[in-house]
Design a protein with these regions (language model features):
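Acidic carboxylate diad motif detector
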Residues: 1-32, 80-81, 251
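Positively charged, helix-rich recognition surfaces that bind polyanionic ligands
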Residues: 35-325
Length: 325
């Protein structure tokens, strides 16, 4: 066969002994102006017997995205049968700083694209494009945004790149403004995409390390049954999160951490259980009284028994106990 391309193959993880590779495909994803390739293999593994674990012990995990000093607290973990102190999972400060830089770059590009949209929208609407043009949808994305929606920097960048192929794609004044925007922000755009891809990969690796450590204890793992997809990482019409909370959500990505734990547990046949999330933070783990008046406070005192609770630790204890029931 003719050799079209040679490249190094880096294993995400080893193929288990006795497994059979059923098929494979090459996936290409764009990162800025470059492409990244992944070889994805579908592997059939031998069936493992479910792991037998003690029924009187559990690992309770309270997943969240609370800001702590220079980092973000991803979760609080407690071992119900051990004398170990509760463990807060904090994202590495270096990773958080890098992702915050990504958010800063994104904010700069967002603001610049918003100003660009104010300039070129009237010019584009004066000279509509033929609907049969191959880039009509791109032109429409530039020109037909409602007044309350700003121009995306992704759309602006794509249009600027296409202008270098077809300079008459849009009116001359609009094209000039778009190319000036591209000249001033193209390097920042590429930096954003490259850093984002790198840091998201670092975050995924960090979470998989934590998940592997958890399943190595070979104990029941208990999580709250929460649909974390409702906390979107980006703005959308169904998301009421503040900008600050949304940024912390992006930094921590609880759904990615949860998926890493579930995948590791399935791989090692460690049992995992979901419990109802209602009142896990508000229920006193000492006497069982529910503090319905509790807001977002980190610490609170039970009015019945006087025990002072750390909100996250208390939730993890209750989650573990619910899992053992």
């Amino acid at each position: 066969s003719k050799i079209m391309q040679e490249f190094d193959l880096i294993y995400h993880r080893d193929i288990p002994d006795g497994s059979q590779i059923q098929n494979g495909k090459i996936m290409r994803t764009r990162v800025g102006d470059k492409f990244k390739y992944h070889v994805v293999l579908t592997v059939k593994q031998p069936k493992k017997k479910p792991l037998s674990v003690p029924k009187n012990t559990a690992i309770g995990i309270d997943i969240g995205f609370r800001r702590v000093s220079n980092s973000v607290q991803v979760a609080t973990i407690i071992f119900s049968d051990d004398k170990k102190p509760p463990q807060d999972i904090l994202a590495p400060q270096k990773m958080i700083s890098a992702i915050e830089h990504v958010l800063e770059l994104q904010g700069i590009l967002d603001d610049a694209a918003t100003e660009l949209g104010k300039k070129i929208k009237p010019l584009l609407n004066e000279t509509p494009l033929n609907e049969e043009h191959q880039k009509y949808r791109l032109w429409k994305a530039l020109a037909k945004y409602p007044n309350y929606v700003t121009l995306s920097f992704e759309t602006a960048y794509k249009a600027a790149r296409y202008l270098q192929i077809e300079p008459d794609f849009i009116p001359e004044k609009a094209a000039q403004a778009l190319l000036e925007w591209w000249s001033g922000h193209s390097r920042r755009y590429r930096e954003l995409h490259n850093l984002r891809a790198k840091q998201l990969l670092n975050r995924k690796h960090f979470y998989r390390q934590i998940a592997s450590e958890l399943v190595s204890h070979k104990k029941l793992i208990v999580l709250e049954d929460i649909n974390l997809t409702i906390f979107a990482e980006v703005k959308d019409k169904d998301n009421a999160l503040s900008d600050k909370a949304r940024a912390q959500r992006f930094l921590a990505s609880p759904s990615e951490f949860r998926d890493a734990i579930i995948n590791a547990a399935k791989r090692e046949t460690v049992p995992i259980k979901n419990v109802p999330p209602q009142y896990t933070s508000k229920t006193c783990s000492a006497c069982g009284i529910i503090n319905k008046e509790l807001g977002a406070e980190k610490e609170w005192t039970c009015s019945a028994c006087g025990v002072v609770h750390d909100r996250d630790v208390n939730a993890a204890k209750n989650i573990a106990e619910l899992g053992k029931q």
